[in-house]
């Protein structure tokens, strides 16, 4: 009865289990198909489908090839062990116990065989599929044309072939070890190995089988010793990377001896098939183990201790020389040579004033500190936003005097920020169909402020009107802050920015970016991919609708070129009238002989990357070769990805171009409008900066002493992270004109004193040209951290900081720039002040300068320079000519104002109303400062001064708007006497809101309510 009652349960179980398995299998297949097909559609949309198919086919090939081989090897040994089982087994307690297992297993032997081989095959296949990069490099490897100095093999062997051989060795060792494991288990289970039987414990058949597998292991070990010899070029035993004296004279001979011992062991294992017992193979294995300890370990240690250590500098000298040469070549710093720089501290005011290549261009706006300022002044609507860290780029603009001027700009794009939507606005239609894009390219000269604020009137706001930037399409559908996906071309109109009053301008996407989802099939697939049923069910989606995904520029390029390591900082630029994201792509390798290894994530980390949400930190991958081989662009409107070869001589790039043909365009295809905005990449510079700290030394003896090693200074902000490099437009010693440089100071590894100054040009004519200024040994010039301490310990600075903070405001130190100036080195640091409350934002309130042991602090750069060098030193900073290449010096050496502009803070003749407004602003500011200086501060008087200042600023904006004739300059140039922006002491004292004319910034020109906006300029 009990048996009968269980039958329905067993029957249901037999039916239910297969059904569940079929359901799970179906779901898995659908999920895989959905992912693959939607990925294919994405790759087709960016014209990189060949990348998708090449990677997919390669992974499938490796999965099948190595999975099947593993399954065959393991399965063959299981079958062989089963077939070699003895027909009769001696009676024993052990065998009686095993018989119970055999009776259960044997009926299902085929299923067990399939299960075991499938499991091992899947594991091996999945592991091998992840090695698609190793496979493609091995198959397509191009020659470096340079042999290594130890074995005289082309470096391509180490970069492309050696890694695959190591992978293949590991695979075969795993296969043989797994085979040995299942063989021993099978022989034991079926009586081929008997542990508790007197007499013969291993049958001859089992012995032969096991001996063959052990012989194969010995052969593979011999191959491992062979490869180990070539691996010595990556040894870290010596002073530098690569084969050292001990490696060459002890380890390499030891590896050769061990190789032959392994071959002898393999022969003994095979010979043991015909012998009784295990004496010979065990003896051989013992000799191999003992030899590996004595010859492979103890002997090299003795050589190192008694031959090398007493005379290490002499013994290691030729190998250190190899390391220096290889490292400099592998990291592209072989042509960087230090040049002596006296770094004089005896400089006159006249010399400083005469330096019109650097002083007028000194950057006062810190892109890592002013995101909130851009947000408050240029956001316009809550659903727009700016990334935490802005960018720096240079533009050549033509002034009213028809002269072209190149200068730095702090730039960003006004991106869509859906976090700014209200609670009632958060629904699927708004988030994915209506609020789809950002709008506007925002820029401000980095050396200019407008009463403490970025000078947008002389940045992007004026350019849509005069066409200087030539912006034709300013909508941003692909950006760093874009949502995961948006659907465009629907029946819903897209919000396109503010219109008159509280109205909104609308538009419909007209581009060809993204994937068409007009068909029900595609909508269903994307609904599955994003887990959103509305994609399938929404009636707003039409046959013309497109879905935009993978919208972060870095993610798009990573998809198009998965073989590239991308720089952590994409930056926007105007290229051919369109907002374009520019990214730098690196080809890397860890297979360059004798080259020092670095961990990318460590050497590229600094105080900005560790705190910024839009700067991607590099992965912790070790490399010993890197090239900036690719420049990539992403169109912000249609998402088009374009790859350009930048270093066409790079063999790693040529290898990848062979693996993925027609995906990288030649360097000659780079348009001039793009080339003008290409810059030397930060992450590469940081890697090279770290290495130059040691490898600027070419003499092996000096390198060994480490006496002249340099380090990257800690950031002066107290974060404990390295100081980031800075892009500056400056004139380097020995150069005729200023250039756009990426710069960094270096300090002595043994002290905090400044040791060197490193810069590399980004100008097209001198791109990649390094300048390395080496300061005299024993100099007393402070490093950045010491200078920061000296500035804040200065009495005048401390007093002013205390005054600002007493009103409840926060002081923010900007980037501490180090600049060669008049034969010395000048430090410049802007100071920003931010009021309390949600409306507060940083405004420039002062500038600190340091030269030698002298500190200057003032409301402007010119004032700070005058305090350090004497009266007249800040004349160049006070001039209106930004970019010394276009300014004409007056008789007193001060650059003459540009046509249509007076000097900074000085209105052009005839502009009486403007002069009055500037004067009123100055008086209101001073009144506010006087009110704050009282003890306690007079906030009533301060509020009144704020109102008067707001009124004066309003008149300034009105007079300098396009409707005013003639236009007048309202900006305070670097070093001007117009006061910096006052800071509200309480939330009630808010800064004046941007005037309506400011909405032109970035092309947000107001339009009629509900109008469909055509692509607007700017």
Swiss-Prot record:
KW Repeat (keyword) present: no
Chain coiled-coil ranges: none
Membrane listed as a keyword: yes
Low complexity: compositionally biased ranges: 886-896, 960-980
Ranges annotated as biased composition (Pro residues): 981-995
Membrane topology: Multi-pass membrane protein
Transmembrane segments: 13-33, 60-80, 109-129, 167-187, 208-228, 250-270, 283-303
Pfam family, one: UPF0182
Localization per record: Cell membrane
Region (Disordered), start-end ranges: 886-920, 960-1018
Chief subcellular location: membrane
Family: Belongs to the UPF0182 family.
HAMAP family tied to this protein: UPF0182
Name of the protein: UPF0182 protein Francci3_3781
Organism listed in the record: Frankia casuarinae (strain DSM 45818 / CECT 9043 / HFP020203 / CcI3)
Lineage: Bacteria, Bacillati, Actinomycetota, Actinomycetes, Frankiales
